[in-house]
Regions:
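G-domain G4 guanine-recognition motif of GTPases
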Residues: 67, 97-102, 120-136, 149-158, ...
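C-terminal effector/interaction modules appended to NTPase cores
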Residues: 1-2, 19-25, 203-408
Length: 408
């Protein structure tokens, strides 16, 4: 995702489902007015979910997801169907495309049941009505219920109506809290600590840093970005001028050094902890970090990241966090790792789950993962809270959230 685009995690996710050759890809192309999806008469052309970002008026920035057929067959087919079902966990609006010449079958009805179970708003789109006789179209139209629409992707019939119906399903902003706008006032100074090490991307800031800067700008406050190596001299300079920063936000990995350089009277937290509140449930993840004290040898711990990136020596998820946990607990647990869209439905065998801040996941998917853990009685925490705990500054790192500090 480029720096000048809306992050994928902040876009409305619109997913198209249906059997093979129901015309999902054709409907996508008709709705978007672009050749976003490959169209073929060969059954099963879409073999993995395909993601495309675009602007779709009047919805604005959206993520269009084309999924494999829900009736795919064989061993590989079953894996593709599983991939389609996984997409549900991040779907804000579901579009079920049905071949009007065959109608809804067991697969479609089962999928509608899943929509209801997950609380996903959806439309049923009967495609290929151009292949029906006049009488057939009339009969189908008589049976159409609210939330269903007849279209022909081939000739564009009723596509505008479909777009208008999709727009009515636009989800409300469900974020309980902003990223940090409620923590600061206009003209407050916020210092962001961004270490530049070998893991930092070349020529840009990572997404959590970009989004935090944007949130500060929207509040009318001031942001100053410094490296951890210049933080102390920067603070000394401002304090000597009688200017006290309202908040310092750091990369969690730098907590140990930064906490020593930031005076106790200045509030300190991390990007990861801010995102824990913004994307998920801070209190749930705070409760989860307490599990560290009961870790034993051979306990299984899942470390999950929402993105896929090239792992280097010293990678935070696969190297640093396991080392911190081993050093803090004095135990030798077994670590397992997932990244990107992969997250197990069954986490019951894990002692705990440690998740990244989830900046690349939309809110629905992050909350799904938290719910998976909660429903199965498995504690979940996030990188920032865990690092704060092992460095001995957990209570201080929650300075912006006094109600959370009381729980420590």
């Amino acid at each position: 995702m480029g720096m000048n685009q809306t992050p994928a995690s902040e876009r409305v996710h619109i997913s198209f489902f249906g059997k093979r050759n129901a015309g999902k890809s054709s409907v996508i192309n008709a709705v978007t007015g672009q050749d976003l999806a490959i169209v073929s008469s060969v059954r099963g052309t879409t073999t993995d979910p395909v993601y495309k970002t675009m602007e779709l008026l009047p919805l604005g920035p959206v993520m269009i997801i084309d999924t494999p057929g829900i009736d795919d067959e064989g061993e590989l087919g079953a894996l593709r169907v599983r991939k389609s079902y996984q997409v549900l966990n991040k779907t804000d609006i579901a579009i079920l495309v049905v071949d009007s010449t065959t109608g809804k079958g067991e697969e479609e009805l089962a999928l509608i049941h899943r929509f209801h179970k997950k609380g996903i708003p959806y439309l049923v789109v009967y495609n290929k009505i151009d292949l029906l006789s006049g009488e057939g179209i009339k009969d189908l139209a008589m049976s159409v219920r609210p939330g269903e629409v007849l279209v022909s992707a081939a000739d564009g019939m009723n596509i505008q109506e479909l777009k208008e119906k999709i727009a009515t399903l636009k989800p409300e902003d469900t974020h309980k809290y902003p990223l940090l706008q409620d923590l600061i006032e206009p003209l407050d100074l916020v210092i962001l600590v961004v270490p530049i090490d070998k893991a930092a991307p070349k020529g840009r800031l990572i997404l959590p840093q970009q989004q935090t800067i944007r949130d500060i700008l929207e509040r009318g406050a001031l942001s100053l970005v410094v490296r951890d190596t210049e933080l102390k001299s920067t603070l000394d300079h401002f304090l000597a001028q009688g200017v006290c920063p309202k908040l310092v936000v750091t990369d969690s990995q730098a907590f140990a050094r930064v906490s020593k350089d930031v005076p106790e009277n200045i509030t300190l937290t991390s990007f990861s902890i801010l995102f824990s509140r913004y994307k998920g449930e801070l209190e749930t993840q705070l409760e989860g970090v307490a599990t560290l004290s009961s870790i034993q040898d051979d306990d299984r711990i899942l470390i999950a990241e929402g993105c896929t990136h090239h792992r280097q020596c010293g990678d935070i998820g696969t190297c640093k966090i396991p080392d911190w946990i081993r050093n803090y607990t004095g135990k030798k647990p077994v670590f397992e790792f997932t990244s990107g869209t992969e997250f197990p439905d069954d986490v019951s065998s894990y002692k705990m789950v440690v998740h990244c801040g989830g900046c690349m996941l939309n809110e629905r998917e992050m909350k799904y993962r938290i719910a998976c853990c909660r429903d199965q009685g498995v504690p979940i925490t996030n990188y920032g809270l865990l690092i704060a705990q092992v460095t001995g500054i957990l209570k201080r790192s929650l300075g912006p959230f006094p109600e959370m500090q009381k729980l420590v």
